A protein has these predicted regions:
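Structured, non-membrane catalytic/scaffold regions adjacent to prosthetic-group chemistry
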Residues: 1-35
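Transmembrane beta-strands of outer-membrane beta-barrel proteins
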Residues: 139-141, 176-181, 215-221, 256-262, ...
Length: 354
């Protein structure tokens, strides 16, 4: 079966969502689409609808302490006990509790629920989600302009896959990004020279909010070849940078996250002192994912074995979706290079997804 209408060269970069879209768009292959929220999605949705008193009693109830719901109305007790039972099921399937403990908690919850006179009505599930088949296309090309340390430039960028935090996340998982082979070419006015500015071989970021019920790990992984300037000597050259980090994210609202990460980084380049560096990185930032505006702002402190990477980087990125496959973007960063010449860059671009 030949799925989709992409030319041959584009099939090299096809991601799983592209294949799913191709099947969905092929006449006669798909009769309908059903949305099934996961158990975790249902639990989170139900917990967010509860009153403060209900939420306070939810965890004790899930531990089998059913007396925690005694001050609630019967309807509120029923909602807490049913959600707590789903949570206990989740913990058991995730192998966070043993079978004996699962049975003890389940028996306590179901016994308490059976004593209530409230009928078991249809549970209110999370509303139908935004279908990924309506998400933006995975490939992206952009043209833009900006300035680095007073030197104006024009930029062309191409990313085969897949999604950035500042892209429109309609139909996709908020707070998650995967960038693969993101290529940036620049022409600087001062030197009238076109250079490879950066090649992001792989960039993965997951900002998954933690709460009283779930505590997922937020993380970042990156590998990139970048043209950089040594602030101590002013020399430019290419550096292969890699980093991994992990931490926690909290949600101040459905579309506003705060996060903190700690990680390690390293780089190799012929023009660097001793050709390499290693660093420990601490990062704090926020991500706002409104429908018509995506904003990422963070500060990263690097403790490095080389003066080259000893810095505090302040970075901000913004994206404004214009249509399904069009957006405007702006990027800014400022490097405080520990007493050496600082770096500052700003750029704006138009992006097209295809």
């Amino acid at each position: 079966m030949r799925c989709g209408r992409k030319p041959g060269w584009r099939r090299v970069f096809r991601c799983p969502l592209d294949t799913a879209k191709a099947v969905y768009r092929s006449p006669g292959l798909v009769k309908g689409v059903s949305y099934r929220p996961s158990r975790r999605t249902r639990i989170v949705f139900q917990a967010r609808r509860m009153t403060a008193a209900q939420r306070q009693s939810l965890l004790p109830a899930a531990e089998g302490k059913t007396a925690a719901v005694s001050d609630l109305t019967e309807k509120e007790r029923a909602e807490v006990l049913e959600t707590a039972y789903q949570y206990v099921q989740y913990l058991y399937v995730a192998e966070d509790i043993e079978l004996a403990e699962y049975r003890r908690r389940s028996f306590a919850l179901l016994s308490a629920r059976s004593r209530l006179q409230v009928p078991a009505g249809a549970k209110e599930e999370k509303p139908v989600g935004r279908t990924p088949f309506a998400a933006h296309e995975s490939m992206r090309v952009s043209v833009g302009a900006g300035s680095r340390n007073g030197n104006a430039f024009q930029e062309f960028a191409f990313r085969p896959a897949y999604h950035s935090l500042e892209d429109d996340d309609f139909g996709l998982l908020p707070g998650a990004e995967i960038n693969f082979l993101n290529l940036r070419l620049r022409r600087y006015d001062r030197t009238d020279k076109t250079v490879l500015n950066r090649l992001d071989v792989l960039g993965i970021r997951s900002l998954s909010p933690a709460d009283e019920l779930f505590s997922p790990l937020s993380f970042t992984v990156s590998l990139a070849l970048a043209r950089e300037e040594d602030p101590a000597t002013g020399r430019e050259g290419y550096v292969l940078n890699g980093s991994v980090g992990a931490g926690k994210t909290v949600a101040a609202a459905d579309n506003l996250y705060f996060y903190a990460l700690a990680g390690v980084a390293g780089g190799y380049g012929g023009f660097l002192p001793r050709n390499q560096y290693a660093a420990i990185e601490l990062t704090a930032g926020l991500f706002a994912g409104f429908d018509r505006l995506k904003l990422l702002a963070e500060a990263k402190k690097s403790f490095s074995s080389s003066s080259f990477a000893e810095r505090i980087r302040y970075r901000a990125e913004a994206g404004m979706p214009l249509a399904k496959n069009w957006s405007l973007a702006a990027e800014y960063f400022f490097d405080d290079n520990a007493g050496k010449d600082n770096d500052e860059e700003f750029s704006v671009s138009v992006r097209y997804y295809f």
